[in-house]
Amino acid sequence: MNSNNTTIFQTCRQAAGITQERAAELLGISVRTLAAYESGSRPVPPLRAADMVDLYGTQFLAMQ
């Protein structure tokens, strides 16, 4: 994790131009849960990571 506590999940979401609120809504999770995934304080379940790959339009996450 880098110095400002972002993860590749946050970086990919931001690169896709999607707000945290919108991403959480589209993923069917709370903003708090998404924030926990993005900060690295909660592991991202494999199926949720697959949903993020689809939503953010990046295959980079699929390789992680």
Task: Show which residues each predicted segment covers.
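Short alpha-helical DNA-recognition segment
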Residues: 11-36
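A detector for short, charged/polar N-terminal pre-domain segments
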Residues: 1-4
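Short, conserved catalytic or interaction motifs in soluble domains
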Residues: 39
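DNA major-groove recognition helix of helix-turn-helix/homeodomain DNA-binding modules
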Residues: 46-63
